[in-house]
Curated annotation (Swiss-Prot), chain A:
This is Phenylalanine--tRNA ligase beta subunit. PANTHER family: PHENYLALANINE--TRNA LIGASE BETA SUBUNIT, PHENYLALANYL-TRNA SYNTHETASE BETA CHAIN AND LEUCINE-RICH REPEAT-CONTAINING PROTEIN 47. Keywords: Aminoacyl-tRNA synthetase, ATP-binding, Cytoplasm, Ligase, Magnesium, Metal-binding, Nucleotide-binding, Protein biosynthesis. The keyword Magnesium applies. Gene3D superfamilies: 3.30.56.10, Bira Bifunctional Protein, Domain 2, Phenylalanyl-trna Synthetase, Chain B, domain 3.
From Swiss-Prot, chain B:
The keyword Nucleotide-binding applies. Belongs to the class-II aminoacyl-tRNA synthetase family. Phe-tRNA synthetase alpha subunit type 2 subfamily. This is Phenylalanine--tRNA ligase alpha subunit. Keywords: Aminoacyl-tRNA synthetase, ATP-binding, Cytoplasm, Ligase, Magnesium, Metal-binding, Nucleotide-binding, Protein biosynthesis. Tetramer of two alpha and two beta subunits. Its cofactor is Mg(2+). It is found in: Cytoplasm. L-phenylalanine binds at residues 339, 382-384, 422, 448. Its main location: cytoplasm. The keyword Protein biosynthesis applies. It comes from Halobacterium salinarum (strain ATCC 700922 / JCM 11081 / NRC-1) (Halobacterium halobium). Its EC number is 6.1.1.20. GO terms for cellular component: cytoplasm. Mg(2+) binds at residue 424.
Amino acid sequence: MPVVDIDPDELRRLTGHRSKDDDELRQDLFGLGIEYEGETEDGDFKLEFEADRLDRLSVEGIARSLRYHAGDDRGVDIPDTNAPEWAIDVTDVPADRPYVTGAVIRGVDLDADALDSLIQLQEKLHATMGRKRAKGAIGIHDLAMLKGDTVDGDGTAARSLTYTGIDPDGDTFVPLDDDAERTPADVLTEHPTGETYADLLADHDTYPAIYDDIGLFSFPPVINGRRTEVTTDSRELFVELTGTDQWTIDRMCAIICYALDARGATIEDVTVDYPDRELHRPDFAVRTKHVSHDRIETLLGVEFTTEAVVDLAERAGLDATPTDDGYDVEIPPYRVDVRHPVDVVDDLGRAYDFNDLTPRYPDVNTIGGRTESSRLERSVRQALVGLGFEDLLNFNMTSEAENFDRMRLTPDHDAVGAAQPATIAEPYSQDFTILRTWALPSLAMVLETNTHHAYPQDLAEVGFAAHADGDTQTGVAERRTVAAVLARNDASYEDAKARLQALCDEFAVALETPPTTHPSFIDGRAATIEIDGQPAGVIGELHPGVIVEHDVEVPVAGFEFELDALR
Amino acid sequence: MQLPTQQVAVLDAASTDDPQRIEALAADTDYPPETIAGAALALEAEGLVAVTETTTTTVSLTDEGHAYATDGLPEVRLYRAALDAGADDAPVEMGSVIGAAGLDGPQVDIALSNYARKGYGTIDSGALAADPDADPENDPEADALATLTDGDSVDDDAVVDQLASRDLVTVSERTVRSVTLTEAGVTELMAGVEATDEVGELTPELLASGEWADVEFADYNVAADAADHTPGKTHVLRQAAERVTDVLVGMGFQEMAGPHVDADFYINDCLFMPQDHPARNHWDRFALSNPARIDELPDALVERVERAHREGAGDDGDGYHSPWDEDFARALALRGHTTSLTARHLAGLADADVEAPARYFSVEKAYRNDTLDATHLLEFFQIEGWVLADDLSVRDLMGTFREFYSQFGIHDLQFKPTYNPYTEPSFELFGRHPETGELIEIGNSGIFRPEMLDPLDVDGDVMAWGLALERLLMLMTGFEDIRDVHGTLCDVGFLRNAEVVY
């Protein structure tokens, strides 16, 4: 979840709530669902919130929400924009990054705090909506440093810039935080910011580049040129965004424009000239969702008058116009989270305050129950506990070493537990690389961990095991397995068999144990578990090699078989 | 009066003026000493005898002590050899004296270290001098060894301690209990004391013969500790899962089951999680390399899900402005939440078609590649529950969850509006820890979005919630480190002693 650092004094100034102390501010923020996570060294609030309201990634956005919440502002507010003087001409752009948008901002007054806030907003938008700049990247420039040639006199735009694709070594510029002229390709290998974002351009034949009359000044999505760097002296800004989706970069652009508008700047349109169409940006178009009055009432469980709904909408920063059966609700351009009318209902609920709703138990009658397999599992577990076993619960993930090697087994053996395991692609730890194909290795590991505790240690687990199997829907055969070990000075095959026999008797199945060999067990002391005539598992005395491998100093007898055999 | 046989025997054998040791009484009466001790203590409690305790110290020679008693102490032998070599006049070379004394092995060090201590002379730079005035005939340690060899006792505690520190003697203390008849005991004896028939164990023979009716059973020390017994026991986390299951079944929920390894399609795409959502590429998911892809997905469902992602749901819905690739949806992974089971059930792929009204739940494992610590493991149990009905409201959601949590002693539930890709409205659930009073997050909930339900062809509203079973167990029992409980590093002792959850 995003965390944003906010200067509480800035928040007081931008909300106009100048007399509120820090505690009151924190309380107001909690009301918006924004959590106070502590303070920075500079005394800023560290605020954490959910990833839907990206319009709140700046102090300006949070102040706007607080003003709506307090009733200071109502309804949708669209900033006035001036007619375009600048155009972005789009020619031969890289296929993987075809979209661009932008805005001109005039009359900004950036003190250090405001500049910090703008940079933070840019970074947070990159991290969230921009998907680490892959989907959308923002460049902000000092407009005074740009030179646009005068276009034809048709009155739409007098100056133009060009967004295009260039050869990686096709031009040079001086990037931010640097002194040397470099080609874009050099930036990716020689500049720290370039190295960070080099992966984004790994598959590109041509690199994105933005030109003015003087030359290359922006290398999206990596870095701006030093010539157009924004400082506290900058009074006019050029904002450009490039990306893989027009809608996404237009929303990011709107969020930035709203933040600057809140600081008194004037927004000026930019014309984006694609080869096949012309766009006027920023896109401040209002979207409309139709919400039925009935849906509002059924979803919130409260009856409302039309006036009440309109009032709640305005306090949520929306505008609701009543229709025959509901409302046409206008959504401001900075809202990126409203996809469906239910999102509007959620906004209304927040404005109403969900915690004022009275809980009620729904009048819905259903019959509860467990699955048959879960009932069987519970009964077998209870039977094992009755036989004196300590019920265990182990991880389903394990490693090849534990599952096979330390049990003297390989996946290719013809033996219980031997199978091709389902394998984890990029294991986080060497201890968890596969799903276990059987459960006895887990019990052996528990014995290994607990050699300091008193014996006997009679352990059992009814749990999950799986192996790769192309005949199943998911390619993995999953099953429930029953495993048990008896560890004690005189543990023997007979002890294990006596308990297995008792268990089978409880479930009224016939047990036979013809001799077998299994790498994990002593030859001549291992048997196939046949239940009702079907092979279901293995029983025996664990091989001394397995016991010693697990640092256990007493004999161990055990068994494992498929739970379903007891059905 | 009537008394158990062994007590009568003690009374008969005891006298008023001659204290008798327990062992002597045992020899007289043919009972084992521990039986007599028990009888004597019982009689003392009745005031019939007095039991006095005296502690005696026994000093006995060790093998080494015996040897020195015969051969002489090594330092004395060294002194005599030194005198023979003329060391009382002038120092002589040590090696020859040691040889002459017949010392070897560890005895050499013993002789040398005690020689100077006891004033037989000095040792300097390998030369040995002997004090002509020393008196080996009256060496107190040698005398004590001789005395002990004769079976007499040594009164000088300092010498005994010295011999004990040289491991030449062992000192043991023994408590001796002696029994004397009291006035009351004499009176009772005069009045006449009869023996009752008392048995130690109830035997099959006693039961069969009917003799049990005529015997007294010896008293046990019923307050004494018994030997440890390790019972079979259901795992504490499993007990908690059973408890949760009981509550949910009681509330009308039907259990779900389904695959641990599943396609991303069911884990994420069916839940309207955009494919470029950070969590879907994040390292916290366990993707599989073998097998890596699911072969079969229902074509019509895939098409509806893709459309929801691209276009949203309803007349004026918006989709995600994100890529959607069917191949990406086919990737197999360990389920990061059991909401994949919900998706399969709502889609009608698990059971028959699910129709309103319905309640479903599962308490099953989910997998998350998290940092291991006291509250996080790579595998955890997720409690997942949902209700399908017509016109469910936020108030119904609140009422259901309030009821559920109150079953675990968690009241005054609070609902914090939050964001979740597949629910709207969405709420984090907070409750007060029953013991610490702290407000902590205990679950996540919401009403499924139309973009999720429409492609699954669900008619009605669905409210759902999830939380980690481990978190609930920690709340219920106050235990602190999940690693003691779950997995192969578990502590069997901890599990044996864990309090039962019911």
